[in-house]
Amino acid sequence: MAEEANKDADISSLSLSLDPEIIGGQNNFLENNLQQIFQKIIQERGPFRDLKEEDLQKELQKESIKDESSAKSSETENVLEFATLDSKRNVNDTEVESMDSQAYKKELIEQIMIAQTECSLALDMTSLLLSKFKENSIETISPFLKSTVPPSSLQFSRSQPPESKESDATLAKCWKEKSLTSSCKFLFEAKERLTSVVETEHEYYTELVKVKEASWPLFNSQGSNHLSVQYSCLGGISLGLGLIRMKPESKSFEVQSSLLYSQAALKISILNKDRDEIGSSTWSWPSQNCNSVLLKDIYKLQEILFEMDIWNSLLQEAQSCGNQGVNFTGDEILVPISDDHVVRITLETSSKNTESGFTEDKKSNEDTSTNFVTIKQEKELLKCLCDTLNAIAHILFLKHCRKSDRRSQQPELYMAIDANAPLILRPLIFYYNLNQESLEFQRWLKQRDISFKFMPNYPWEKAKDFLELENSLSINRLSISWRIMVSNFEPAIFIQHTPTLHGTDKSVWRCKDQYSSNQFSSLKNVCQYIEHHINSLSRRSKKTE
């Protein structure tokens, strides 16, 4: 009860002045007692809608006269003060005293009038809308609107249509024609777009069918709507996946790969003692007879990757061939074949393959026709030798990539590297050394006028297909027979040469005459044996004489 009495006392002491500067200082009190303040305003001022602007202006004039006659400090001690509407003003500012209070009051009244008009209009429209359903809503309508507008007038079911004109039919027809024309154009453009999409999809899957019929495996790429083709499945040890996509500019399909080179080929050259190239061979693949551009791209990528795999395998094998004089860097592999000649193996990655040829010095232009023919023949022989070495390297690498269990004439290839190192350089060195050793033995026999018959038994000469050729080139042991006729009256000497690529068997020369059978581990010992045999025959002939 004491608290309610204090509240009544506080409200009774509240001054309802129209000057906003007089009210202030007790904002919390006003916020907590707004309902009681509204009751006091209605008691003293009456309903808000009955107020008139003239009465408010007269009251403002009276208050302004009263404010001018009283002291500013004594009259505002027991009066609540409201904060000014302008947030930028400060109560402690010294410029507040010099402001024109009349202009500020006028601005406040204008804002109140605007708010009153908006609230009154909103109340009238809401009451007029609800007057059809609630009868007491009529009481909140303003007297002027109540006298001019009937209740529930906002609920009319329809408005009166305008009068029809002769041009309405023509206008409607024009709009319909325009609508049909635009719809037809839109449908035609949609048809063209769909036709283009369907034709592109048809062409795309037609190309995929051609790729699939050519035995190229296709895979679904994760995170992409396009398929990938494995272009290394027919050879090589790398995976080789390419994404099949369409070129936006040419509307054609291509295989996007991660290869660094647009063209690659293995090149084998022969260098002289001055490191000049006297013969070379760059590998080239035969052209594929196919009408599909996509298949041609796949074959090209396969050839590039295959050549890169051969080069990587040669580098891997060269690391274990140092005892045979093989030197290698990241760009070339050097294999010595004699004191004056070296075989160089490189990977050509230029856009155009360089033509292999014989490097002639300036003196070759002054040679006679006989020397020219000799040089030309030497050039052809060197070119043939390089081509042979290049072909054998490709065959041995293909053998390295194949599985051990083959099926008929179409063996499957696998992508993993064998546990054993590749066998490409070592067989080439083995075949070349064997040939040089045979030529050296023949020259030695000719110098001594010894008749002989060379009877090699090379397994690749009997190969009937490509698989047998692969197997024959990778055979570990060969067999070469010699028939030496030292005299017309004595039986011939039979020599069986069995060179081995691997192993610890050193007795590779087996010599048999009418008196004994011997085994030797080198050609030098064989030559000494033949000389000893000839000397023995000569001594016997002298004794008989």
From Swiss-Prot:
<keyword id="KW-0804">Transcription</keyword>
<keyword id="KW-0539">Nucleus</keyword>
<protein>
    <recommendedName>
        <fullName>Mediator of RNA polymerase II transcription subunit 17</fullName>
    </recommendedName>
</protein>
<comment type="function">
    <text>Component of the Mediator complex, a coactivator involved in the regulated transcription of nearly all RNA polymerase II-dependent genes. Mediator functions as a bridge to convey information from gene-specific regulatory proteins to the basal RNA polymerase II transcription machinery. Mediator is recruited to promoters by direct interactions with regulatory proteins and serves as a scaffold for the assembly of a functional preinitiation complex with RNA polymerase II and the general transcription factors.</text>
</comment>
<dbReference type="GO" id="GO:0003712">
    <property type="term" value="F:transcription coregulator activity"/>
</dbReference>
<keyword id="KW-0805">Transcription regulation</keyword>
<dbReference type="GO" id="GO:0016592">
    <property type="term" value="C:mediator complex"/>
</dbReference>
<dbReference type="InterPro" id="IPR019313">
    <property type="entry name" value="Mediator_Med17"/>
</dbReference>
<comment type="similarity">
    <text>Belongs to the Mediator complex subunit 17 family.</text>
</comment>
<dbReference type="GO" id="GO:0006357">
    <property type="term" value="P:regulation of transcription by RNA polymerase II"/>
</dbReference>
<feature type="region of interest" description="Disordered">
    <location>
        <begin position="148"/>
        <end position="168"/>
    </location>
</feature>
<keyword id="KW-0010">Activator</keyword>
<comment type="subunit">
    <text>Component of the Mediator complex. Interacts with med18, prk1 and rbp1.</text>
</comment>
<dbReference type="GO" id="GO:0060261">
    <property type="term" value="P:positive regulation of transcription initiation by RNA polymerase II"/>
</dbReference>
<dbReference type="Pfam" id="PF10156">
    <property type="entry name" value="Med17"/>
</dbReference>
<dbReference type="GO" id="GO:0070847">
    <property type="term" value="C:core mediator complex"/>
</dbReference>
<dbReference type="GO" id="GO:0003713">
    <property type="term" value="F:transcription coactivator activity"/>
</dbReference>
<dbReference type="GO" id="GO:0006367">
    <property type="term" value="P:transcription initiation at RNA polymerase II promoter"/>
</dbReference>
<feature type="compositionally biased region" description="Polar residues">
    <location>
        <begin position="149"/>
        <end position="162"/>
    </location>
</feature>
